Amino acid sequence: MLESFPKPFTAVVLGSSRGIGLALVGALLEHSRVERVVACARSPESSNELQSLKERFDGRLQLSIVDLTEPPTIAAVAGGLQSAGIRPGLVLNVAGLLHHGESVTPEKRLEDLDLESLQRVFAVNALGPALCLRHFLPLMSREGKAVFAALSARVGSIGDNRLGGWYAYRSSKAALNQLLRTASIEARRRFANVIVAALHPGTTDTALSAPFQSNVPEDKLFTPEFVAERLLHVIDDLDSDHSGGFFAWDGQPISW
């Protein structure tokens, strides 16, 4: 796996303190092609799991503070890599927001729409990733294959929307998809080796999906570790013809 990437390369994971992001950090560190992993989170020092990985893979794991709602933190990490002469071969934006206590919950009807909640969900799911594209895409490796991928969601597909509801989450992921698609077009002109893609991880047993798992069949609820490995397989299979695409965890394309 990851044999399509030049060896060695640096990977950046944004949103790495738990769930799929944490599993991706662990999976990447197990691969010999990966020289360095930059794990970004709002409070990486408070993640026992990241600290354990840091002890185990000392020298190969860099922990950095990034809050997608705080643009200077995104610029600081990208600037630090640039100053060190490091060009990432893989950038993964995994952070996402569906619910947060009682202040942010998925809407079931129009009357549930709230400006503050909408702004918060869009800030994490679309605006933050847009700034990650701004700062990281020009920084990425020019040697061989490089990939910028972000976790979207099937519910962000306009063509696949048959149930309605979840206004903020659906529309913010649709916005993310458009941002990635648009960035892929610019990348073809400016950074021809960089592939840009949206990925759907499937329903994963994480804090994000926990309140909504009751009706999910057991064989459709995946562990973060399974999803991380599957996503890396999908990423490994991507080529320039796939740039600007939207793909599920099993590699199948998803309609916009």
For the regions a protein language model found, what residue spans apply to each?
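Conserved N-terminal Rossmann-fold NAD(P)-binding element of oxidoreductases
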Residues: A11-S17
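N-terminal Rossmann NAD(P)H-binding glycine-rich loop of SDR-like oxidoreductase domains
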Residues: S17-A27
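Conserved glycine-rich Rossmann-like NAD(P)H-binding loop of the short-chain dehydrogenase/reductase
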Residues: L29-E49
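Rossmann-fold cofactor-recognition segment
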Residues: K54-P72
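A glycine-rich helix->loop->beta "capping" turn
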Residues: D58-Q62, G80-A95, H99
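Conserved Rossmann-fold cofactor-binding substructure of NAD(P)-dependent oxidoreductases
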Residues: D67-I86
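Catalytic loop of short-chain dehydrogenase/reductase
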Residues: L97-L127, S141-R190
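C-terminal helical subdomain
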Residues: A198, T206, A210-W256
